[in-house]
From Swiss-Prot:
It comes from Pseudomonas syringae pv. tomato (strain ATCC BAA-871 / DC3000). Residues 39-107 form the KH type-2 domain. The lineage of its organism: Bacteria, Pseudomonadati, Pseudomonadota, Gammaproteobacteria, Pseudomonadales. The gene is rpsC. GO terms for biological process: translation. This is Small ribosomal subunit protein uS3. Keywords: Ribonucleoprotein, Ribosomal protein, RNA-binding, rRNA-binding.
Length: 228
């Protein structure tokens, strides 16, 4: 059977960057790794309704800089910045070093793999038909400018006795092209029938020479002059 590598892991250092950036020797590496895991679990639990896509952690010189990528920055910041300050204090206590929090707004949530997966999962939990949820997400992504998108759901779809896998795709999703900028994410929908897994692949274009490929309208062909 075919073995499928993680679409983001294979592109690290090519078109994707690490979400944790720090250096540690053998004695502290495991401690830093475990601390990052706990920080992400804490933030994802606290910010469930904030549409958080990604959490980047940098550790420069006895400090920590955490960047939260969210489609709803107002929920993270809170009234007059009270919520983000409470988060900073809790994370400083948890990590044992001064923490700085940056918030990056996601302008196009329809093109973010994690947010699309969360949206489909939430619709499945509200008992929306899985085909309708997938088709709606695919159409929104293609309308915004995606070059291709694939969504796959697995589990007891529609309350069926036997679990199965269904998928829907539009455009092209070149998983074997390393320069292809593919955003991949997976999420779980907890329904009354059990857990349904949601996977999303979004192809945004190819990165050539460190620059994102841009869609340019084709120039009209020159008109031929009529012979006199």
């Amino acid at each position: 059977m075919g073995q499928k590598v993680h679409p983001i892991g294979i592109r690290l250092g090519i078109v994707k960057e690490h979400t944790s950036v720090w250096y540690a020797d053998g004695r502290t590496y495991a401690d830093y790794l475990f601390a990052d895991l706990k920080v992400r679990e804490y933030l994802q639990d606290k910010l469930k309704s904030a549409s958080v896509s990604r959490i980047d952690i940098h550790r420069p010189a006895q400090t920590a800089r955490i960047t939260i990528h969210t489609a709803r920055p107002g929920i993270v910041i809170g009234k007059k910045g009270e919520d983000v300050e409470k988060l900073r204090q809790d994370l400083t206590k948890q990590m044992g070093v001064p923490v700085h929090i940056n918030i990056e707004e996601i302008r196009k949530p329809e093109l973010d793999g994690m947010l699309v997966a969360q949206s489909v999962a939430q619709q499945l939990e509200r008992r929306v038909m899985f085909r309708r949820a997938m088709k709606r997400a695919v159409q929104n992504a293609m309308r915004i400018g995606a070059k291709g998108i694939k969504i796959q759901v697995s589990g007891r779809l529609g309350g069926a006795e036997i679990a199965r896998t269904e998928w829907y795709r539009e455009g092209r999703v070149p998983l074997h092209t390393l320069r292809a900028d593919i955003d991949y994410a997976n999420y779980e929908a907890h329904t009354t029938y059990g857990v349904i897994g949601v996977k999303v692949w979004i192809f945004k274009g190819e990165v050539i020479g460190g620059r994102q490929e841009e869609l340019k309208p084709q120039a009209p062909a020159p008109r031929k002059k009529a012979a006199k």
